[in-house]
Amino acid sequence: MKVRSSVKKISPDDQIVRRRGKIYVINKKRPRNKQRQG
């Protein structure tokens, strides 16, 4: 999980999800693309 000040989609399969006030990027096909903002 990468923690960044600005999260962007790396690949088209990425999904941007908001959980508990934080923005996450999740990708089932490429778990290494996981990101969290903050």
Swiss-Prot record:
Enumerate the SUPFAM superfamilies for this protein.
Answer: Ribosomal protein L36
A Pfam family recorded for this sequence: Ribosomal_L36
Q: Biological process GO annotation list?
A: translation
> What InterPro entries does the database record attribute to this sequence?
Ribosomal_bL36, Ribosomal_bL36_sp, Ribosomal_L36_bact
Q: Which GO terms describe its cellular component?
A: ribonucleoprotein complex; ribosome
Cite the entry's keywords alphabetically: Ribonucleoprotein, Ribosomal protein
Q: Which GO terms describe its molecular function?
A: structural constituent of ribosome
| Family of this protein | Belongs to the bacterial ribosomal protein bL36 family.
Matching NCBIfam families: rpmJ_bact (TIGR01022)
In Swiss-Prot or TrEMBL terms, this protein is called: Large ribosomal subunit protein bL36
